[in-house]
């Protein structure tokens, strides 16, 4: 596809699947999610923009009984049944050693690897902004592949990091339950702000 000139719009039904018709899932069917689909989520999400193409987000897929046993105690009590019912739980993290990949992902500026090595505050700034940005892309990629996402912030990051990432520089930022919904939403969709309350013009 050419990136010059007018770009095509996605069909209305695709926009609905990603945004207006999509709902957060709180319980899930037993239908498994295969490796190809989970890999496909990343294959979509990785193309969205990040600052200097740094791509600091990483994903841990938890789906075995053993993995769930390790994860659930670190979730807020009210969130545990949601993750227990999901066939897959994605722990989204940021890699504070993201700069080691810069010669590959930013070949026009390979020297930035050495710059970030000596600037831990700048690495923190990159991960704190771009990690959550990529998390948003990840949720949309889940929906694009016909699955429901249930993002949750109610967990103990330090506990998850100690349990799963003790030997790495990954640090958890979000937990996302993934699968097919077990049934209709438990409550009506909540309102969103109308443009009159959210937009300004200059």
Swiss-Prot record:
Cofactor: FMN
Molecular function GO terms recorded: oxidoreductase activity
Key words, A-Z: Flavoprotein, FMN, NAD, NADP, Oxidoreductase
Pfam families reported for this sequence: Nitroreductase
Alphabetical list of CDD domains matching this protein: RutE-like (cd02148)
Highest taxon of source: Bacteria
Broadest EC class assigned to this enzyme: oxidoreductase
EC assignment: 1.-.-.-
InterPro entries xrefs: Nitroreductase, Nitroreductase-like, Nitroreductase_HadB/RutE, RutE-like
Claim: Ribosomal protein is one of the keywords in the record: no
Family membership noted in the UniProt record: Belongs to the nitroreductase family. HadB/RutE subfamily.
Identification of the protein by name: Putative NADH dehydrogenase/NAD(P)H nitroreductase SCO7141
Species of the source: Streptomyces coelicolor (strain ATCC BAA-471 / A3(2) / M145)
């Amino acid at each position: 596809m050419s990136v010059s000139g007018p770009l095509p719009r996605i069909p209305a039904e695709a926009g609905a699947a990603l945004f207006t018709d999509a709902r957060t899932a709180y319980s899930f069917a037993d239908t498994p999610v295969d490796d190809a689909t989970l890999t496909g989520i990343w294959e979509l999400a990785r193309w969205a923009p990040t600052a200097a193409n740094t791509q600091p987000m990483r994903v841990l897929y938890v789906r075995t009984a053993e993995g769930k046993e390790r994860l659930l105690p670190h979730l807020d009590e009210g969130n545990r049944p949601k993750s227990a019912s999901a066939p897959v739980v994605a722990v989204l993290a940021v890699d504070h050693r993201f700069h080691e990949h810069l010669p590959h992902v930013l070949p026009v500026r390979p020297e930035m690897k050495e710059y970030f090595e000596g600037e831990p505050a700048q690495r923190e700034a990159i991960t704190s902004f771009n990690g959550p940005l990529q998390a948003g892309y990840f949720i949309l990629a889940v929906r694009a592949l016909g699955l429901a996402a249930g993002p949750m912030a109610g967990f103990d990051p330090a506990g998850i990091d100690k349990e799963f990432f003790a030997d790495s520089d990954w640090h958890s930022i979000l937990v996302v339950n993934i699968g097919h919904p077990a049934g209709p939403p438990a409550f009506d969709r909540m309102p969103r702000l109308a443009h009159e309350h959210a937009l300004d013009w200059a």
